[in-house]
């Protein structure tokens, strides 16, 4: 005989539908992180260079890296979240050019080709990507990896 909890979940899934049930049952993110489409995001207002930001993201476990931004909707959700905290400082993301040949890669291994480069961004000797505050964090700049900035981490739930 099914427990009351199992019966309640079955009833909820039948009445509310799978979308509502998935929101109710979605895994929780670490305290201070936010959830969007099977991922948790942590925005950190600490100043770190790009490589130290990536190492700090990895230290949180769960396969966390500097965030990959894979489509316009995800970019919009992130933008709204960050602008709730600040509107002036760039934020590191996980896109970088490790061979310094303009062959950009995501630190989490994502292969999505979505890119939102600011058309005015300079590329010489700049091999790490940041979200641009002048465009509400919806476009990206190439910047020197040694600069110390805020950063955004992401992991899959």
From Swiss-Prot:
> C-type lectin domain: which residues?
36-154
The positions making up the signal sequence are: 1-22
Keywords of this entry: Disulfide bond, Glycoprotein, Lectin, Secreted, Signal
The disulfide bridges present are: 29-40, 57-153, 128-145
Q: Does the keyword Cytoplasm apply?
A: no
What CDD domains does this protein's entry cite?
A: CLECT_REG-1_like (cd03594)
Q: What is its main location?
A: secreted
Q: Which positions are glycosylated?
A: 49, 62
**Any one Gene Ontology cellular component term annotated for this protein:** cytoplasm
The listed locations are: Secreted
Q: One Pfam family this chain carries?
A: Lectin_C
Name any Gene Ontology BP term.
Answer: response to bacterium
Residues reported to bind a carbohydrate: 97-102, 134-136
What superkingdom heads the lineage? Eukaryota
Q: Name one GO molecular function term.
A: heparin binding
Q: What does this protein do?
A: Calcium-independent lectin displaying mannose-binding specificity and able to maintain carbohydrate recognition activity in an acidic environment. May be involved in inflammatory and metaplastic responses of the gastrointestinal epithelium.
Q: Which PANTHER family match?
A: MANNOSE, PHOSPHOLIPASE, LECTIN RECEPTOR RELATED
Recorded protein name is: Regenerating islet-derived protein 4
Q: What is the lineage of its organism?
A: Eukaryota, Metazoa, Chordata, Craniata, Vertebrata
